[in-house]
Swiss-Prot record:
Protein name: Uncharacterized protein encoded by LINC03043
Superkingdom as given in the UniProt entry: Eukaryota
Pfam families per UniProt: DUF5557
Organism the protein comes from: Homo sapiens (Human)
């Protein structure tokens, strides 16, 4: 399958760290939760609310199980502590 990415389980994110945000695109609503580094490419899986973070330095995207991509520009969350992309596919 091409180049592999290094993936690790995402740390548990509490409500205090980030609230749940909703993004709307042509596929419908996507709920995203939490904040992480901009240099990560986030792959979201709905399997028992486990989130995989796949390292990718350039052009981070949100990938949903519906193969819907949302640009970082639309998905980036601004946070007092950290600014980044996030998430959990609800």
């Amino acid at each position: 399958m091409g180049a592999e990415r290094v993936c690790t389980k995402a740390p548990e994110i509490t409500q205090d760290e980030a609230e749940i945000y909703s993004l709307t695109n042509m596929e419908g609503n996507i709920g995203i939760k939490g904040c992480e580094f901009k240099s990560w490419l986030f792959k979201f899986y709905q399997a028992r609310s486990q989130v995989l973070l796949c390292g990718e330095v350039k052009n981070p995207y949100l990938l949903t199980s519906n193969k819907t991509t949302v640009k970082e520009q639309n998905a980036c969350l601004t946070h007092p502590d950290r600014s980044a992309m996030a998430g959990l596919l609800l």
